[in-house]
Amino acid sequence: MALSGMRAGWLPEKMRYSVTEVRAELEQLLQDQLTPLRGRFKDVGIRLAPPEGVEVVPGASLLDPATLRDHVTRFGERIGTADLRIAGVHWLGQLGYALLPPIEIAMTRSGIGLDASLSNIGILQPNGQPAEIMINDLRNTIVLPERYSGSLPLAQIGTPIDSAEALRHFVLTGLFGHTFRPLIERIHDFSGVSPKVMWGQVAYEADLFFGQLFRAAPELQTAAWEEDRAAFFQRHEWDLSDGPSPLYGPTRTTLTVDPESGEEKSRTLRSTCCLIYQVPTGRMCGACPLAPKRDTVAEKRATAGERRAAHGVAAKTA
């Protein structure tokens, strides 16, 4: 990874800040960058030191299948299901809600690449589920000078790099190669849920950040925004493993016909179902790929007894 400008870590003595000052200034910068997203990501935040009185789950602890299963089981209780397949998919979605926006926005708006590997994060759970993240060690942080506009000297933030491609590769590797991939593998092992479904959930949450940032602050749809989004979701291949990228195309646009007006409307749907319709609460996510077939989904969700009762009533009235 090539360096830009001064040798990484070198600054005249009078320009140096203490580690505490750097952490405080950087945390404030990262929190401020999240401001446009508060309408959708109300609880999301990023910490560089643990707050008092909040449960912090060490990311590395989730590599233990029993510990991970316990977290997934408890999350299933929150959403009303004992099915570990559904609980696993939506626990991953909740983790994505907490983890992805802070890391992605640091990359896109500030040119800062934070090491979000599972071993380097803590997951803050003020209400028993992932809400914020904490970066344990900043020593692996990298910075793209052309995107950075903070008040701290760049060399005290991290190692300068010379290309946006290097920045994206670093972030992709940490987030998806060293965090979500091992979690997906373990959840698949104990629940049997398809990795494709889990990757679909993670990719949707990752792309949701870009869409929300554009809706909340259209002026932030910069070249960096477009390049980063395309690199994450429009490449068929990735270099983290063999085979096609599981992040490719998290959504698709389809035409639907309004049953009352007969007008065609475009609608953005998930490419992969998240399984939430199987939870016995009668709900579907707003971007459900099964939404155009809502009646079919309702029938699938009905119990065998309800279907038999419906057929019996129909026979009597025939």
Language-model regions, residue ranges each:
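Hydrophobic, aromatic-lined core segments that form the binding pocket/scaffold
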Residues: A66-E264
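Aromatic-residue detector
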Residues: L37, E55, M107, I133, ...
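Cys/His-clustered metal-coordination modules, chiefly Zn-binding fingers
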Residues: A224-A318
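Serine/threonine-rich low-complexity intrinsically disordered regions
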Residues: R7-P12, S18-E25, L30, V57-P58, ...
